[in-house]
């Protein structure tokens, strides 16, 4: 009976292709679609709803299959607004997951979750496309040796080094220099490693995405005169997008990064801003699909969804994807399931401090709060490890003395402590450096400092060789 009713609907709609279905229910961004017997799409297949709304405007909505409901029905999540969709509308199964353009043509351009350019600079002549759902690299293909990813930024390389193919959490409020740090990393990976970057804007403010784009053009990270010389591809799925788009935009950015790693054999930087919004979008979709919520209202599949994204970010024998992820901590609660699940995947954390930014020390990376799992003597070497520990001990002691200095003044300290404070203040200044991308704002030429140079410089500072120099030197 169901089949006869279905075929009558098909004849009424004039549908001829066997992979076509029709909408039976719409609840916000979630659609139920009926398909002919034996023509059910697979989970994660994308399908397209085409037609016209009552006002005569054309509709083209891409959806992704999330559940097979039985009775030849599937439940899918829309990747764009569902305004104007009606029951009975025609649905065409593409027979494959969502595929996006990859390769050099993506550099300097802005894409949405579907891989469509949204920067009003014309179509992208893509020679290759890649599906956004893929397995993580096989165990045999992974790079097993742990190596440091040199950034040319002193404070990062010395005290909280990044692992090549690792994941780094970036913590910091508004106005402490997150964007400038991100742009400097994009610039340095292009110059020092011959690599490229992909920036995924996940569920953040559209204004911030626009500001980042404008600043990248100003600092020549995106080259307007010769777009192919740009060093970054941008993929945006901002706050105004439906939850389906925000949940998948991270995978679109990752797919573009994987092509540079696997086919071009390059080192790639993948930025995700903000990884919490990826979890939040997944939570919204989970509720819309009718799943029972887990702890604090999050989706029961939280760890699986996070793992599917994070496990694809790694070093292989061909190249590497090193990921820097901005992490929003809701209500500053580190035990919240979203940040707690993220922390399990991170190799390092870079914490930006408002106090250092207020002193005018940039990059405002907090040397004591930032951490790294690769700061071990058998990975970075004894010399690097000892210098880093010495710098941290000096800064920690300075932090402990700050209350005494504030109440009694510097003169009440012992001779040894006064010397330590002088060294700590020099170290604090020495941890700052001018950035290439900030040249247009500061007028100071940028500096890329190699790791060996950084270690040697701090060794001199911390052994007392520079005690005779003033702090400003």
Curated annotation (Swiss-Prot):
UniProt keyword annotation of Chloroplast present: yes
GO MF entries: ATP binding; ATP hydrolysis activity; proton-transporting ATP synthase activity, rotational mechanism
EC number: 7.1.2.2
Location(s), subcellular: Plastid, Chloroplast thylakoid membrane
Gene3D superfamilies cross-referenced by the UniProt entry: 2.40.10.170, Bovine Mitochondrial F1-atpase, Atp Synthase Beta Chain, Chain D, domain 3 (1.10.1140.10), P-loop containing nucleotide triphosphate hydrolases (3.40.50.300)
Main location: plastid
InterPro entries (UniProt xref): AAA+_ATPase, ATP-synt_VA_C, ATP_synth_F1_bsu, ATPase_a/bsu_AS, ATPase_alpha/beta_chains, ATPase_F1/V1/A1_a/bsu_N, ATPase_F1/V1/A1_a/bsu_N_sf, ATPase_F1/V1/A1_a/bsu_nucl-bd
Membrane association type: Peripheral membrane protein
SUPFAM superfamilies for this protein: C-terminal domain of alpha and beta subunits of F1 ATP synthase (SSF47917), N-terminal domain of alpha and beta subunits of F1 ATP synthase (SSF50615), P-loop containing nucleoside triphosphate hydrolases (SSF52540)
Keyword list, A-Z: ATP synthesis, ATP-binding, CF(1), Chloroplast, Hydrogen ion transport, Ion transport, Membrane, Nucleotide-binding, Plastid, Thylakoid, Translocase, Transport
Domain of life the protein comes from: Eukaryota
Catalyzed reactions per annotation: ATP + H2O + 4 H(+)(in) = ADP + phosphate + 5 H(+)(out)
The name this protein goes by in its record: ATP synthase subunit beta, chloroplastic
């Amino acid at each position: 009976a169901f089949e006869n009713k279905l075929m009558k609907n098909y004849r009424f709609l004039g549908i001829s292709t066997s992979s076509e279905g029709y909408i039976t229910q719409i609840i916000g961004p979630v659609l139920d679609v009926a398909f002919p017997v034996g023509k059910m799409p697979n989970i994660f297949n994308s399908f397209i709803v085409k037609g016209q709304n009552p006002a005569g405007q054309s509709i083209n909505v891409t959806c992704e299959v999330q559940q097979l409901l039985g009775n030849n029905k599937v439940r899918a999540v829309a990747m764009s607004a569902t305004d104007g969709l009606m029951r009975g509308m025609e649905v065409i199964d593409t027979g494959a997951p969502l595929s996006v353009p990859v390769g050099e043509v993506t550099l300097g351009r802005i894409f949405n979750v579907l891989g469509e350019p949204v920067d009003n600079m014309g179509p992208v002549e893509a020679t290759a496309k890649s599906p956004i759902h893929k397995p993580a690299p096989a165990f045999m293909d992974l790079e097993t040796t742990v190596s440091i990813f040199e950034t040319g930024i002193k404070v990062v390389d010395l005290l909280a080094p990044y692992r090549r193919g690792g994941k780094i959490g970036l913590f910091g409020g508004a106005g402490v220099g997150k964007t400038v740090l991100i742009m400097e990393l994009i610039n340095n990976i292009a110059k020092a490693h011959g690599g490229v970057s992909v920036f995924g804007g996940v569920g953040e403010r559209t204004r911030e995405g626009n500001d980042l784009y404008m600043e990248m053009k100003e600092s020549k990270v995106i080259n307007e005169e010769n777009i192919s010389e740009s060093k970054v591809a941008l993929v945006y799925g901002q706050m105004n997008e439906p939850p389906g788009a925000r949940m998948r935009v991270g995978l679109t950015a990752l797919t573009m990064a994987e092509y540079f790693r696997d086919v071009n054999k390059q080192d790639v930087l993948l930025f995700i801003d903000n990884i919490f919004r990826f979890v939040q979008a997944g939570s919204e979709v989970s509720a819309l699909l009718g799943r029972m919520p887990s702890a604090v209202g999050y989706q029961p599949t939280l760890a699986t969804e996070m793992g599917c994204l994070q496990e694809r970010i790694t070093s292989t024998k061909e190249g590497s994807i090193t990921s820097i992820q901005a992490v929003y901590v809701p209500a500053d609660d580190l035990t919240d399931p979203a940040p707690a699940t993220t922390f399990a995947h991170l190799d390092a954390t870079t914490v930006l401090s408002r106090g250092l930014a207020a002193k005018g020390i940039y990059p405002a990376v907090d040397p004591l709060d930032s951490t790294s799992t690769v700061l071990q003597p058998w990975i970075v070497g004894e010399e690097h490890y000892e210098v880093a520990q010495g710098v941290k001990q000096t800064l920690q002691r300075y932090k402990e003395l700050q209350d005494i200095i504030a109440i009694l003044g510097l003169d009440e300290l012992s001779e040894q402590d006064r010397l330590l404070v002088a060294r700590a203040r020099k170290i604090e200044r020495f941890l700052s450096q001018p950035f290439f991308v900030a040249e247009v704002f500061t007028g100071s030429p940028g500096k890329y400092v190699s790791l060996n140079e950084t270690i040697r410089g701090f060794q001199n500072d911390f052994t007392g060789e520079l005690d005779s120099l003033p702090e400003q030197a």
